């Protein structure tokens, strides 16, 4: 009573998304496996390529590490950089470390870092 792979695939293709999720969970329990992708295993193999990719990085994130001793000035600087409201900027500053801006150019990241450091913040560009 062997079931062909095609029959299994046809049956699965007619299932709802929730049914497929439940099926995957049941298979994980029955066979003691996980359907999660092994991302960490692939990372070491790309070690040599990662060095070259780091040199070509074009998008940067500006992260507020701490607001230092002048929180009000840092909040004002964050508001002018991000166009956030007062409450949102205050929450961002008080929630340090937190990203101020993400996916920006190197020049823009350096300019934002300069503005925030002048206001008294500790900044990290990633």
Swiss-Prot record:
Gene3D superfamilies recorded for this chain?
3.30.1390.10, Single helix bin
Q: Which Pfam families match?
A: Ribosomal_L12 (PF00542), Ribosomal_L12_N (PF16320)
The record's annotation in SUPFAM superfamilies points to: ClpS-like (SSF54736), Ribosomal protein L7/12, oligomerisation (N-terminal) domain (SSF48300)
Which keywords does this Swiss-Prot/TrEMBL entry list? Ribonucleoprotein, Ribosomal protein
Q: Which cysteines are joined by disulfide bonds?
A: none
Q: Superkingdom of this entry's organism?
A: Bacteria
MF terms (GO), sorted A to Z:
mRNA binding; structural constituent of ribosome
Q: Which InterPro entries match?
A: Ribosomal_bL12, Ribosomal_bL12_C, Ribosomal_bL12_C/ClpS-like, Ribosomal_bL12_oligo, Ribosomal_bL12_oligo_N_sf
Per the UniProt entry, what is one GO biological process?
Answer: translation
Question: Partners and quaternary state?
Answer: Homodimer. Part of the ribosomal stalk of the 50S ribosomal subunit. Forms a multimeric L10(L12)X complex, where L10 forms an elongated spine to which 2 to 4 L12 dimers bind in a sequential fashion. Binds GTP-bound translation factors.
As for what it does, the entry says: Forms part of the ribosomal stalk which helps the ribosome interact with GTP-bound translation factors. Is thus essential for accurate translation.
Q: Which family does it belong to?
A: Belongs to the bacterial ribosomal protein bL12 family.
Q: Which HAMAP family match?
A: Ribosomal_bL12
Q: What is this protein called?
A: Large ribosomal subunit protein bL12
């Amino acid at each position: 009573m062997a079931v062909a792979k095609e029959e299994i695939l046809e049956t699965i293709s007619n299932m709802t998304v929730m049914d497929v999720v439940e099926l995957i969970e049941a298979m994980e329990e029955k066979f003691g496996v996980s359907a999660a992708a092994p991302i960490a295993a692939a990372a070491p193999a790309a070690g040599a390529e990662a060095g070259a990719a780091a040199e070509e990085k074009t998008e940067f994130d500006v992260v507020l590490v701490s607001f230092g001793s002048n929180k009000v000035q840092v909040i004002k600087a964050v508001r002018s950089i991000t166009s956030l409201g007062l409450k949102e900027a205050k929450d961002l500053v008080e929630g340090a470390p937190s990203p101020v801006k993400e996916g920006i150019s190197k020049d823009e990241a350096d300019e934002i870092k300069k503005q925030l450091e002048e206001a008294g913040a500790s900044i990290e560009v990633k």
